[in-house]
């Protein structure tokens, strides 16, 4: 099997394809062989993507107008393309091996061996098709919000939504007191951004602990990780590459979230209405925190789910806002 060190990454990474072309044209013999291997894997991923598309088209007549939408079709297409890339990256089908063997200088193969290899590849393709058809729609949502270049990291820290809430609650409570907002709202925002902790951005150590998907701008001096993300421009979803902040702990993530809001004047109006969850989340949304036109409503729906867990008994408005620099973290009755 070919070496998988040449990560083909995200299937729509055009810049990566251009680098591959330059390597093939300008590199030495070893670089050319490496480029051939990567190109073979790209071809395999395209073939697999076409196979998955044909499978989806065959089932299009069974779709329900009530349960389907254009956004769902877009997300499913993006998921299928990324699945095709991952199949090729792991060498699941074997087509790339055959291409490299046929095109590499000095390598020959008997016709019988080629025929056997083709039949084996077709068996692997059929297995991949069955695997893809069994993927649930829940995987689709988790794979694209947020969309990641790195393969999804299944967190071992949260084995359920209840676990996600209970483990983050102490950090959220502290941050909520500093901002003067509802603690469950912060957890809801983190749940939406990370798929309940199952889809956080991956760095060299594992999860980046970035619960709020705050990007690493020029002012950020800490660790960062590059990834693909789904942004909206004029209500149209677009895949972009961006750098995100990386933290050593969840506590750091919550603390930086507080600093991020308090140090940006555009969020001042939203912070002035922290006692009202709807006005606060809609306020930071309008100020540019997220580009998804439905972002605030999605956060509020997740918050309603968390509130039903009965983990929050404090009355509304129990917290007053404190500056991040303040060392007072006690709650005051309003």
Curated annotation (Swiss-Prot):
Region (Catalytic): 160-334
Active-site residues per Swiss-Prot or TrEMBL entry: 231, 256
A GO molecular-function annotation: amidase activity
Residues passing through the membrane, by range: none
A biological process term (GO) from this entry: cell wall organization
The keyword Hydrolase is assigned to this record: yes
InterPro entries listed in its UniProt record: Flagellar_prot_FlgJ_N, FlgJ, Glycosyl_Hydrolase_73, MGlyc_endo_b_GlcNAc-like_dom
Compartment(s) where it occurs, according to its Swiss-Prot or TrEMBL record: Periplasm
Keyword annotations: Bacterial flagellum biogenesis, Cell wall biogenesis/degradation, Glycosidase, Hydrolase, Periplasm
Note from the entry: Probably exported via the flagellum-specific export pathway.
Stored NCBIfam families: flagell_FlgJ (TIGR02541)
Function: Flagellum-specific muramidase which hydrolyzes the peptidoglycan layer to assemble the rod structure in the periplasmic space.
Similarity comment: family membership: In the N-terminal section; belongs to the FlgJ family.
Name this polypeptide is given: Peptidoglycan hydrolase FlgJ
Organism (species): Vibrio cholerae serotype O1 (strain ATCC 39315 / El Tor Inaba N16961)
């Amino acid at each position: 099997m070919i070496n998988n060190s040449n990560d083909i990454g995200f299937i729509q990474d055009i810049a990566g394809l251009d680098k591959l072309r330059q390597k093939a044209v300008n590199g030495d013999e070893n670089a050319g062989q490496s480029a051939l291997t990567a190109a073979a894997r790209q071809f395999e991923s395209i073939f697999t993507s076409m196979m998955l598309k044909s499978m989806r088209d065959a089932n299009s007549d069974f779709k329900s107008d009530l349960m389907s939408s254009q956004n769902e079709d877009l997300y499913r297409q993006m998921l299928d393309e990324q699945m095709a890339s991952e199949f090729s990256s792991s060498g699941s089908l074997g087509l790339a091996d055959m291409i490299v063997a046929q095109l590499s200088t000095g390598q020959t193969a008997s016709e019988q061996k080629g025929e056997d290899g083709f039949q084996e590849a077709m068996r692997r393709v059929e297995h991949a098709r069955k695997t893809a058809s069994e993927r649930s729609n829940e995987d689709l949502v988790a794979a694209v919000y947020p969309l990641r270049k790195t393969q999804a990291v299944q967190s071992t820290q949260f084995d359920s939504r209840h676990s996600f809430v209970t483990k983050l609650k102490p950090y959220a409570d502290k941050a909520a007191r500093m901002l003067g907002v509802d603690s469950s709202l912060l957890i809801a925002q983190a749940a939406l951004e990370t798929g309940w902790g199952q889809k956080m951005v991956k760095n060299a150590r594992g999860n980046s602990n970035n619960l709020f998907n705050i990007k690493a701008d020029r002012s950020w001096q800490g660790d960062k990780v590059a990834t693909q993300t789904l942004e909206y421009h004029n209500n149209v979803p677009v895949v972009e590459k961006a750098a995100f902040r990386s933290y050593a702990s969840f506590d750091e993530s919550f603390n930086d979230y507080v600093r991020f809001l308090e140090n940006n004047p555009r969020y001042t109006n939203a912070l002035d209405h922290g006692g009202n969850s709807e006005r606060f989340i809609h306020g930071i949304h309008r100020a540019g925190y997220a580009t998804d036109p439905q972002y605030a409503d999605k956060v509020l729906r997740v918050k309603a789910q968390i509130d039903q867990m009965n983990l929050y008994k404090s009355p509304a408005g129990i917290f007053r806002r404190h500056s991040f620099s303040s060392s007072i973290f006690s709650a005051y009755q309003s």
